[in-house]
Amino acid sequence: GLGKTVQAIGAAELLRRHKFVESILVVCPTSLKYQWKSEIERFTGADVMIVEGVVTKRALMYNEPTTYKIVSYHTMANDVRYLGHIDADMVIMDEVQRLKNWNTIIATAARRINARYTVALSGTPLENKLEEFYSVMELIDQYCLGPYYEFRNKYIVTDSTAKVISYKNLNDIGKKASERLIR
């Protein structure tokens, strides 16, 4: 089928050409930065920059008028710590399953990217815990599943020690998420 990278680039270009976005930040594993750069150049002809180097240089790079900026998850987390936040009109997060644990440094930093549009890509389904699904969905639309305490009360069954023993209302969560997912 049409790859997730090409679909994300297509969505970004559609928004860019209709003037909804000017700056697009791609956050991906280090090993994929140059692949993303190559694909963006191949399909768009837009200017592309890989955000790398020392932190003071990277801080300036985020303010460059380049259309596409590409950064690794670890660099993004360090930069958010240094800058407080990162701004972009659109963010594309590749291999988003890396953010499945809500309270990790990288997941916390990812939530501090200010963007009007967020696209989360994964070729690996989240299979283990509903809490992991919440973490990823919260990046896409923080209002979709509500605050975590409400989510936990509505969908998670725990024992007397607060250990998760099962899940409930899965059809409801499926309906809410289906409006935001392409499988």
Across the structure, where does each feature detected by a protein language model lie?
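A short helix-turn-beta junction within AAA+ P-loop NTPase domains corresponding to the substrate/partner-engaging
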Residues: 133-146
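Conserved motor-coupling elements within RecA-like helicase/translocase cores
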Residues: 56-69
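ATP-binding Walker
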Residues: 2
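Conserved SF1/SF2 helicase motif Ia
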Residues: 7-37
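Conserved helix-turn-beta segment of the N-terminal RecA-like "Helicase ATP-binding" lobe
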Residues: 32-54
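Walker B catalytic acidic pair
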Residues: 94-95
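Inter-lobe coupling linker of SF2 helicases/translocases
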Residues: 70-85, 105-111, 115, 120, ...
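Conserved helicase motor
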Residues: 50-58, 73-78, 102-103
